[in-house]
Amino acid sequence: MPPTVTAAEPVTTTGHVLPGEADYHALNAMLNLYDADGKIQFEKDREAAKQYFLQHVNQNTVFFHSQDEKLDYLIENEYYEREVLDQYSRDFIKSLLDRAYAKKFRFPTFLGAFKYYTSYTLKTFDGKRYLERFEDRVVMVALTLAAGDTELAEKLVDEIIDGRFQPATPTFLNSGKKQRGEPVSCFLLRIEDNMESIGRSINSALQLSKRGGGVALLLSNIREHGAPIKNIENQSSGVIPIMKLLEDSFSYANQLGARQGAGAVYLHAHHPDIYRFLDTKRENADEKIRIKTLSLGVVIPDITFELAKKNEDMYLFSPYDVERVYGVPFADVSVTEKYYEMVDDARIRKTKINAREFFQTLAELQFESGYPYIMFEDTVNRSNPIAGKITHSNLCSEILQVSTPSEFNDDLSYAKVGKDISCNLGSLNIAKAMDSPDFAQTIEVAIRALTAVSDQTHITSVPSIEQGNNDSHAIGLGQMNLHGYLARERIYYGSEEGIDFTNIYFYTVLFHALRASNKIAIERGTHFKGFEKSKYASGEFFDKYTDQVWEPKTDKVRRLFADADIHIPTQDDWKQLKESVQKHGIYNQNLQAVPPTGSISYINHSTSSIHPVASKIEIRKEGKIGRVYYPAPYMTNDNLDYYQDAYEIGYEKIIDTYAAATQHVDQGLSLTLFFKDTATTRDVNKAQIYAWRKGIKTLYYIRLRQMALEGTEVEGCVSCML
């Protein structure tokens, strides 16, 4: 019997409203209006979520008479990947669906439900009908990642549907679908200083963007504008034309995938084209050089800060000459270490700019555009446990892994395949993880899920990405809902207790993540390539955990862990883990990275990443539907005080919180800085210096609160008044 549909309209944002019922969009808007007693109407948003199903989702969902009918239809019509389901018995698949549906999951917010149905769920090929509910998507993700392991599939369903673990968008969106992109979030590529590498990088960017991932590229090794080519002076065009080629490539590849084509480029602060590079983001930049859609990142070593502190000039070095003198690409040389040696070396062409003016320019641009991102090169490499150099980050500034150069033949085939980087991401909801019946298991299941993403990804069109993934099995376990959790427990973000919790939480997560990776290495009898040269193998990584006691400094945090029945690892625990790691290794070269978590935090009902909320009631513009309102998780009319927004909290407390987490994270954390509209470029520079001093690894966007509408707020409007 063919499936039936209960309504004839396509999937649009309008629904069928019965007389006397409020439209779900109108109900959601009431979240932004106080009631007669001056209270926020949280119940209106819950009602909006309910009405969204009654008025819209249920009426546009294909109805099947049984699970068998549904599964057969989706496989035969090439909606689901047969290979995924063939790893299990039909009885098991049905029992897993029953397990998911028995949880009685409900979206707590309208935006969560709306995001899920517009962006993630499987639809008919004409886009007019829904073929999955949330439970079906969770089951398909679990079946895909568990790869035939029924016990892991059951655990994954529990962790995801209970909201403790949320795979990143590409994994959650694509898993189990026949027509799909890759489950990987993003990629990082190096470009070397030759035409073959540049040409191949453009092709790689197209290939990766087509598959739905953001791509970040390193430009630091490209010879500067005016450098010689084949010993003829003033020939090179520098980095700007390459940026233009990349920007056009991403806008083209955008047409092929479900996600926007997105790219970032990173340049070293001591590259002679640095000002040209930054000028591409100026509002008044000439169209010939203006870069509108590429994200920009700058790699800044310690020496740049030291020169600015002394108000000295900073020298910019020709990458072409540096590579000739040192025999390695510019990005692989430590500028801090070799700075004065390079200044004195007559073979290396150099120009100079004022170091303070450079920082002033950075701040001006961040005011204008929010860019560039910043990577603190020496901080990143000092805390890197893996042999080799980290040269740049990704589109969200949280991926920090070692890459190595590739070499190409004239026809752009690989003469030597280097190591490039892919990001296999997913995040824990801190509040739900703290509520977990088994904290260690929650982390282990998450690590196994992310490892599966790495194991199942084969991007053969870009051999350096494939090589890097096969060698490293690198993953990035993230975190979200820190502010939501702290507020729920009546702790202020950035307070002594807030920072204490962040420290101990990340400390405990690290222990269990390493232990899980060590377990996988033991089970498979192998570890990541290059483990022998790592600080894990030497034992150096573990010194800070075995040589000192890590425990809560405040009674409140001690109590939170005790009440949650979560054991805080002791020095003895670390000694045992160190012994096992040195003996058997770990499977994943990298384990943690904290991304900004956009859409998945709405579905999971979390505050995004580990930064504070930008507002108590967030306003989002969502396609044709227009304004949608999202209430901060766990917020009630009784605990509003604990939801100070990021602009009120200020950069110091945000940086202090991130610093507490950073010391336990092998990669990076997306850190956005928020400033009130009264801020100056001096304030931005002070924040950058404070972040550098505190051991922060990267800075993501700068956000300025726009107060242009001051004095025009609607009376009694929550998002304006709070």
Curated annotation (Swiss-Prot):
What GO annotations for molecular function exist for this entry? ATP binding; ribonucleoside-diphosphate reductase activity, thioredoxin disulfide as acceptor
Query: Which residues are involved in binding substrate?
Result: T169, S185, C186, G214, N394, L395, C396, S397, E398, P596, T597, G598, S599, I600
Q: Does the keyword Ribonucleoprotein apply?
A: no
Top class in the EC scheme: oxidoreductase
Example GO BP: deoxyribonucleotide biosynthetic process
| Site feature: Interacts with thioredoxin/glutaredoxin | C717, C720
- Covalent cross-link site, Isoglutamyl lysine isopeptide (Lys-Gln) (interchain with Q-Cter in protein Pup): K310
Q: Which domain of life is it from?
A: Bacteria
Which EC numbers does the record give?
A: 1.17.4.1
Disulfide bridge map:
C186-C423
Q: Which reaction does it catalyse?
A: a 2'-deoxyribonucleoside 5'-diphosphate + [thioredoxin]-disulfide + H2O = a ribonucleoside 5'-diphosphate + [thioredoxin]-dithiol
Q: How does it assemble?
A: Tetramer of two alpha and two beta subunits.
**Homology family:** Belongs to the ribonucleoside diphosphate reductase large chain family.
What is this protein called in UniProt?
Ribonucleoside-diphosphate reductase subunit alpha 1
Question: From what organism does this protein derive?
Answer: Mycolicibacterium smegmatis (strain ATCC 700084 / mc(2)155) (Mycobacterium smegmatis)
